[in-house]
């Protein structure tokens, strides 16, 4: 019996157990720990489901006679390396009715051993060759200012399939505060998002002590609230908003009081009173109690996130932040008080500590802050740049060795399952698991985290790296991220979800607005805490010196040491 060496096997079928894969040009490697696509034992080798001329998936060979009515999947992605919060495995991934049905071995049970019963390939099954590729869940951007519709193509081209945030366009309120305020604006934005192949979670304005004004927004389609200092994040407003959120079962996102006008970080934590809350840009450059908002990452009830302009700490990070602040918060550089406000938020010591807290799993999520001090197309990229910098600085995480699976699982969770859990979306999205919407991203390993090869929305290709449409084959230059058939209006709506509060469902919102996109309620998140955020549950002791702004984590002071060079940068981008 002839045997294949590892190199030859990988070239035919993709890497298998024990093989390591470099992520883009970083120092990070993942190792395949299980291969479900091979079949039972070593005898399964050579019996993998592979598509192409003279290959396996042909009539009466790897393709069975099973009809769709008999359970054949609509799509199988063959031999992909799945990177998710729960592990790194190789599998064939089956999709039916837009949802993942199984991860295992696909093929024809009449001719092949070990075929998963939900992965029986039939004449109605499409194939995507995932062999040699990396597959992740679609990214969830947990901090989106909906300033312009052009953000959506940028997001999709970077592998983002879910947007959490708010806005109405380039209004001053939207440019600063991530809020879609009031029932009229919510109806307009829900209608506007109906045409795009993304899931949407709109946040209403929580800065009020009037309960009915918040319930009105919940009935109108808000799936949570945003508390923002530009609208006045006082202890009274925090308490009132959380009281309504507790009753409604929705999440609250917090941008606290940078100027400490209505209280200090201790007063905000007292107003939160142990209740679940999502703390945006926890480091503070994006806003929040100066200089010590970062200490909230130690609280078990606080679900902390970062926004991407401070990820990771580089020699250019501080310089770009001042101008961003002046624009985004409608400040005047000629007014000394406005300038002091901006400068108070930019601290190298807390930005440096943010790197460490991410690597510890103490800051659990990363979002963009799109066009409002953040870049929607760089959520995934900057997450992995941070992981690379931390490996170089801190070495392997516990459990890692030649490969970095523990670190990779922690960092992929920051933009997939963790924001999904935080906002009550995880029953539908956020991971590569059976039953969930097939929002999936396929990467060539050399471009991992930089540019996807394919972005699937609800099991249908919505975006892809595609060459000249007038060429004789799909690959001639220029190869650009382009919309595919899944981005057309009909499949875009059918393949996506609009998340709203349970109160909106009870009030008849889906029927009232007549949206084409399926409308589903968020899960109750009020009893969720950091312990529920996979791979990102740490609650270290965090202290900030009020005079020097030095941050100590579990008693150890963090020294600012910004990096001068990053991977996933000039090798891939001209600008």
Swiss-Prot record:
Enzyme superclass (EC): hydrolase
PANTHER family xrefs: UREASE
Reaction equations catalysed: urea + 2 H2O + H(+) = hydrogencarbonate + 2 NH4(+)
Coiled coil: none
Co-factor remark: Binds 2 nickel ions per subunit.
This protein's pathway: Nitrogen metabolism; urea degradation; CO(2) and NH(3) from urea (urease route): step 1/1
Domain of life: Bacteria
Keyword Nucleotide-binding: no
Cofactor: Ni cation
InterPro entries per the UniProt record, alphabetical: Amidohydro-rel, Metal-dep_hydrolase_composite, Metal_Hydrolase, Urease_alpha_N_dom, Urease_alpha_subunit, Urease_AS, Urease_asu, Urease_asu_c
Gene source species: Frankia alni (strain DSM 45986 / CECT 9034 / ACN14a)
Modification comment: Carboxylation allows a single lysine to coordinate two nickel ions.
Protein name: Urease subunit alpha
Cellular localisation: Cytoplasm
Residues at the active site: 329 (proton donor)
Boundaries of every Urease domain copy: 138-575
């Amino acid at each position: 019996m002839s045997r294949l060496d590892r190199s030859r096997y990988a070239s035919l079928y993709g890497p298998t157990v024990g093989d390591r894969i470099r992520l883009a040009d970083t120092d990070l490697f993942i190792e395949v720990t299980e291969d479900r696509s091979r079949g039972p034992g070593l005898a399964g080798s050579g019996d993998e489901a592979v598509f192409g001329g003279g290959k396996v998936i042909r009539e009466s060979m790897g393709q069975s006679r099973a009809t769709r009515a008999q359970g054949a999947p609509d799509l199988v992605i063959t031999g992909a390396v799945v990177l998710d919060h729960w592990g790194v495995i190789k599998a064939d991934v089956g999709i039916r009715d837009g949802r993942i049905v199984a991860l295992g071995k696909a093929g024809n049970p009449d001719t092949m051993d070990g075929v998963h019963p939900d992965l029986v390939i039939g004449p109605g099954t499409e194939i995507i060759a995932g062999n040699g590729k990396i597959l992740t869940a679609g990214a969830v951007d947990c901090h989106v200012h909906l300033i312009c519709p052009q953000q959506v193509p940028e997001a999709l081209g970077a592998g983002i399939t879910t947007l959490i945030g708010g806005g109405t366009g380039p209004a001053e309120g939207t440019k600063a505060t991530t809020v879609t305020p009031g029932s009229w604006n919510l109806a307009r934005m829900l209608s506007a998002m109906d045409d795009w192949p993304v899931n949407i979670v709109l946040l209403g304005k929580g800065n009020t002590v009037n309960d009915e004004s918040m319930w009105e927004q919940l009935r109108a389609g808000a799936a949570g609230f945003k508390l923002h200092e530009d609208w006045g994040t006082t202890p009274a407003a925090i308490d009132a908003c959380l009281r309504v959120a507790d009753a409604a079962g929705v999440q609250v996102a917090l941008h606290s009081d940078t100027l400490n006008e209505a209280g200090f970080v201790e007063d905000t934590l007292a107003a939160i009173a142990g209740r679940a809350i999502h703390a945006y840009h926890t480091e503070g450059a994006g806003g929040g109690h100066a200089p010590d908002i970062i200490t909230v990452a130690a609280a078990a009830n606080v679900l902390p996130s970062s926004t991407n302009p401070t990820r990771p700490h580089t020699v250019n990070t501080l310089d770009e932040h001042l101008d961003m602040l002046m624009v985004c918060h409608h400040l005047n550089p000629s007014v000394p008080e406005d300038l002091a406000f901006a400068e108070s938020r930019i601290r190298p010591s807390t930005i440096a500590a943010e790197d460490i807290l991410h690597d510890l799993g103490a800051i659990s999520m990363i979002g963009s802050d799109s066009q409002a001090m953040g870049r929607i197309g760089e959520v995934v990229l900057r997450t992995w740049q941070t992981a690379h910098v931390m490996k170089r600085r801190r070495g392997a995480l516990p459990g890692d060795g030649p490969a970095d699976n523990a670190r990779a699982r922690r960092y992929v969770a920051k933009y997939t399952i963790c924001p999904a859990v935080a906002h009550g979306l995880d029953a539908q999205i956020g991971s590569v698991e059976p039953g969930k919407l097939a929002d999936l991203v396929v990467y060539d390993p050399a471009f991992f985290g930089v540019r996807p090869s394919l972005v699937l929305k609800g099991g249908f290709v919505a975006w892809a790296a595609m060459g000249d449409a007038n060429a004789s084959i799909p690959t001639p230059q220029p190869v650009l991220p382009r919309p595919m058939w899944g981005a057309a209006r009909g499949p875009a709506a059918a393949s996506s979800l609009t998340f709203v509060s349970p109160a909106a469902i009870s009030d008849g919102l889906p029927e009232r607005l007549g949206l084409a996109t399926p409308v589903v309620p968020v899960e109750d998140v009020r009893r969720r805490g950091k312990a529920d955020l996979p791979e990102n549950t740490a609650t270290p002791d965090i202290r900030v010196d009020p005079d020097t702004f030095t941050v100590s984590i579990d008693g150890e002071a963090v020294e600012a040491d910004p990096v001068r060079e990053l991977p996933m940068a000039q090798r891939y981008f001209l600008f």
